[in-house]
Amino acid sequence: MPGSPDPAPPELASVTARAPAKVNLLLQVGPRRDDGYHDLVTVFQAVSLHEEVTVTPADEFGITVEGVGGTDVGGVPLDGTNLALRAARLLAERAGVDRAVHVHVRKEVPVAGGMAGGSADAAAALVACDSLWRLRLGLDALAELGAELGSDVPFGLHGRTAVGTGRGEHLVPVLTGASSAWVFVLAEGGLSTPAVFAECDRRREATGHDAPPGRLEAVEAALRGGDVDALGAALSNDLQDAACALDPALAGTVAAGRRAGAVAGIVSGSGPTVALLARSPAAARRLALDLEPLFGAERLRTATGPAPGARVLEAVSTPSPGGRS
């Protein structure tokens, strides 16, 4: 009736959100700081491999995890250290929400693969809980919370392509003139991010060499111009030598990708996933097929970038007393 207030929205029975994996097109690692962290300059690109998180009201916080497309989730924690669960709890605490949720994660991104799957879980959990509890905090506020959970969480929320500085949490969007096509080769085991950074520090101390000069301008120019050859030439990762020292098979994986026709290959982040740049999505599919005899189909993923950041896929309302949802 005219003048009546809008009815209260129905309570939500569940919310499902997803967030993308990332590849580092550039990763410059500064000297180790007194607090143990390193100043980074990186170019993130979100890619079309996703983590999907569903949150439902519960009496207490809990989490379950399943793998999608052959992703091994055996190493994913199911306790209070899980990033998605930590994200839900942190948002409830900061927003003054006195309700708990059960978090269910469907993982497509390799675990401990240098593609920020755990950070994507946290980003999706923040977006899902924000929707479930009708907080409407906005991405910037969620990203500020996300930075407390991990350096890659803010990028998981924003997605696309961005330059990251600090520990990677300060983001500036980068315009891209074309999409990128990738083949990701999964390793048979994971690599510890702290161990890779420590090996990078050790190698620099042993050789007396500091961080090499960066290629940020070259990467940005290649992205703006949509030039796949220039992008391939500009790909750079200061952690690659350290990752290859800890897992010598990685160098062979990069070389195999180049021999099979990849424009370029790079260890993704701290590894051990190897990212192979292709000329097009069709070329990426052919490259993956050519690499199957070497690595097996279960260790190969194709994807494109840039992909959007975390977003809600589905919000299910609680049925009304009359039976309608």
UniProtKB/Swiss-Prot annotation:
Give the signal sequence positions: none
Q: Which domain of life is it from?
A: Bacteria
Question: Which parts of this chain are annotated as the region Disordered?
Answer: 306-325
Q: In which pathway does it act?
A: Isoprenoid biosynthesis; isopentenyl diphosphate biosynthesis via DXP pathway; isopentenyl diphosphate from 1-deoxy-D-xylulose 5-phosphate: step 3/6
Q: Which UniProt keywords apply?
A: ATP-binding, Isoprene biosynthesis, Kinase, Nucleotide-binding, Transferase
Short name of any one Pfam family annotated for the protein:
GHMP_kinases_C
E.C. numbers: 2.7.1.148
Task: Give the matching InterPro entries.
Answer: GHMP_kinase_C_dom, GHMP_kinase_C_sf, GHMP_kinase_N_dom, IspE, Ribosomal_Su5_D2-typ_SF, Ribsml_uS5_D2-typ_fold_subgr
Q: What class of enzyme is it?
A: transferase
Q: Detail which positions bind ATP.
A: P110, V111, A112, G113, G114, M115, A116, G117, G118, S119, A120
Q: Which GO terms describe its molecular function?
A: 4-(cytidine 5'-diphospho)-2-C-methyl-D-erythritol kinase activity; ATP binding
Q: Does the keyword Ribonucleoprotein apply?
A: no
Cited Gene3D superfamilies: 3.30.230.10, GHMP kinase, C-terminal domain
Q: Name one GO biological process term.
A: terpenoid biosynthetic process
Q: Which residues form the active site?
A: K22, D152
**Reactions catalysed:** 4-CDP-2-C-methyl-D-erythritol + ATP = 4-CDP-2-C-methyl-D-erythritol 2-phosphate + ADP + H(+)
Family as reported in the entry's similarity comment: Belongs to the GHMP kinase family. IspE subfamily.
User: What does the UniProt function comment say about this protein?
Assistant: Catalyzes the phosphorylation of the position 2 hydroxy group of 4-diphosphocytidyl-2C-methyl-D-erythritol.
Q: What is this protein called?
A: 4-diphosphocytidyl-2-C-methyl-D-erythritol kinase
Query: Which organism's genome codes for this protein?
Result: Kineococcus radiotolerans (strain ATCC BAA-149 / DSM 14245 / SRS30216)
